[in-house]
Amino acid sequence: MQSRLILIVEDNDDARDALRMLLELDGHVVEAAAEGNEALEIARGKDPDVALVDIGLPGIDGYEVARRIRAADGKRPLLIALTGYGQPEDRRRAAEAGFDSVLVKPVDPNALSDLLATLEIPARGFRG
């Protein structure tokens, strides 16, 4: 699997650290944020290939983070929603906000690896 720059947006320290460790073991470069505004700053500055975004963030929720990333100029990262529920309504709202996929927490490491391996992730553009 190709190494990607992945942004994790998760307010739970343990969940964020576990995801970071899993992704780094798979050879990815990871940036992490605990809340929405921090995530948006990182997304603007680092231009990640993928963003794993918890829906239930304090302050700006994950849906709004996704909408703002989608509205920004530049590359369109693959957006994966992380939710504790996964009900049809959650999936519908995630799609409307601009997410490409939804994973239910706790995230199954194999499901995440499989998702990253099979989904089309846009190639990084020219960065002159």
Feature map (PLM): residue ranges:
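Active-site beta3 strand of CheY-like receiver
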Residues: 46-52, 57
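C-terminal output helix
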Residues: 107-116
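The feature encodes the CheY-like receiver
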Residues: 58, 87
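Acidic catalytic/metal-coordinating carboxylates
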Residues: 11, 35-38, 61-67
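Short amphipathic alpha-helix used as the core "switch/output" element in two-component signaling
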Residues: 41, 63-76, 116
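Two-component/phosphorelay signaling modules centered on CheY-like receiver
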Residues: 13-31
